[in-house]
């Protein structure tokens, strides 16, 4: 029975002493992996930033294309109310105050020149 105890004690001491060495090695491995992980995170962050910049450039390009292809604002036809400060009467028409007496919805209308 003493031999079993001595053998068990010997195995226990060896396991503890070797386990501590493994613990130091594990700590060093973890530090290396952490440093590698940080460089990986920096790489991933830069890659994501590049993709976002490309996407932003595409979106801005699409916006500029839409503004180039969009229609001009429609003009106002004859006899239609217009704004004195911002007349949008079609070519050949002028925004004037009506000559007839009466109650009008707006005080200016598009008339021929």
Swiss-Prot record:
Pfam families the record matches: Toxin_22
Superkingdom of the organism of origin: Eukaryota
Expression tissues: Expressed by the venom gland.
Leader peptide range in chain numbering: 1-21
Cell location: Secreted
InterPro entries, per database record: Toxin_22
Propeptide segments, given as residue ranges: 22-74
Keywords annotated in UniProt: Disulfide bond, Ion channel impairing toxin, Knottin, Secreted, Signal, Toxin
Keyword ATP-binding among UniProt keywords: no
GO cellular component annotations of the record: extracellular region
Record GO terms (molecular function): sodium channel inhibitor activity; toxin activity
Biased composition (Basic and acidic residues): 60-69
Keyword Nucleotide-binding applies: no
Region (Disordered): 60-83
Cystine crosslinks: 75-90, 82-95, 89-110
Record remark on domains: The presence of a 'disulfide through disulfide knot' structurally defines this protein as a knottin.
Role description: Probable ion channel inhibitor.
Membership in a protein family: Belongs to the neurotoxin 14 (magi-1) family. 01 (HNTX-16) subfamily.
Protein name (record): U11-theraphotoxin-Hhn1a
UniProt lineage: Eukaryota, Metazoa, Ecdysozoa, Arthropoda, Chelicerata
């Amino acid at each position: 029975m003493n031999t079993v105890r001595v053998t068990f004690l010997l195995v226990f001491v060896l396991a503890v002493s070797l386990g501590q060495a493994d613990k130091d090695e594990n700590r060093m491995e973890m530090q290396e992996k952490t440093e590698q992980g940080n460089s990986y995170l920096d790489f991933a962050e830069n890659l994501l930033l590049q993709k976002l910049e490309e996407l932003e450039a595409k979106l801005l390009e699409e916006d500029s294309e839409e503004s180039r292809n969009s229609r001009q604002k429609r003009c106002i036809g004859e006899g239609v109310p217009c704004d004195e400060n911002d007349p949008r009467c079609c070519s050949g028409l002028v925004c004037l105050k009506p000559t007839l007496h009466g109650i009008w919805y707006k005080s200016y209308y598009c008339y021929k020149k």
